[in-house]
Design a protein with these regions (language model features):
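Loop-to-helix "switch" segment enriched in basic
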Residues: 25, 63-121
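AAA+ P-loop ATPase catalytic core
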Residues: 43-68
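C-terminal boundary/linker of central alpha/beta nucleotide-binding cores
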Residues: 57-65, 109-184, 191-196
């Protein structure tokens, strides 16, 4: 394993891993992209262009497997983006050759933008920004968004943007969350279905939900991240969430709500 770099935000720390062995990363690509052998030299250039970052390599492989771009097209796009980055700010490259967070973010952003997600998928990504990093049940989230099936979620899992576990818990990779927040700009009006669903749960005072902690963590993220473009609706949401948090003695969320009411 090469070098690692930690990025901190107010929620967590995660590592940007670089594996300098091109063969290991080529094997990783092959696991997701069935034609990797056929385009080996181009695939290896893609791996080099994204600075050997494992998550970027995985996303690139999944993008190629989905047929959204040919290896040659993807390489050209990444090289074009890398050249513009080099011109913009050479100071951001750390002495030992590691790429900075800005460069890494840019690679992931380029891969994200190449997908041209449908309006529905963008809407789902927008709402996924509020989930706790530990994730939540895919079925519960689907119910919150009033989605008829899990199909759209499953499609996003295939892209690599949405992470999942064997227990069908879904979450966003922290870097993808950052990009989704800047691209989709979640607001009270654009996320009204999610807010209405959570509000309905909070109004059922006599009913308990097993996932209450994750519910409150989601509400906490909404408070901190959402664009408050409909103040009356937002305040009503907080006023209805507060007593439900009180039922569970969830003081952290209550304090956060009080600051914003």
């Amino acid at each position: 394993v090469g070098s690692e770099m930690c990025i901190r935000d107010r929620y967590c720390t995660f590592q940007l891993k670089e594996i300098q062995d091109i063969n290991i990363l080529f094997q990783l690509t092959s696991a997701f992209y069935s034609e990797a052998d056929k385009y080996r030299s181009t695939v290896e250039k893609i791996i080099e262009t994204v600075h050997y970052h494992t998550f970027a390599v995985e996303l690139a492989a999944k993008l190629l497997e989905n047929g959204i771009s040919t290896p040659g097209q993807l390489l050209a796009k990444l090289q074009e983006e890398r050249a513009s980055l080099d011109n913009e700010d050479k100071i951001k490259i750390i002495k030992d050759g590691q790429s900075s967070k800005a460069t890494y973010y840019s690679h992931i952003h380029t891969l994200f933008s190449l997908y041209a997600l449908s309006r529905k998928q963008q809407d789902i990504m927008c709402n996924l920004c509020f989930l706790p990093y530990t994730g939540i049940s895919a079925r519960i989230f689907t119910k919150w968004l009033e989605l008829p099936t899990l199909n759209e979620i499953n499609d996003l899992i295939e892209t690599g943007f949405v992470q999942t576990t064997t227990r069908h818990t879904i979450s966003l990779h922290p870097m993808i969350k950052e990009i989704a927040l800047s691209e989709t700009k979640p607001s009270v009006s654009s996320c009204h279905i999610l807010l209405d669903s959570l509000q309905k749960i909070c109004l059922m005072h006599g009913m308990e939900v097993a996932y209450y902690k994750k519910l409150f963590q989601t509400i906490g993220n909404i408070i901190e991240l959402i664009e408050k473009d409909d103040i009356p609706k937002y305040l009503l949401f907080l006023e209805n969430a507060f007593p439900y948090m009180d039922n569970y003695n969830y003081h952290k969320g209550m304090k956060l709500s009080l600051i914003h009411i």
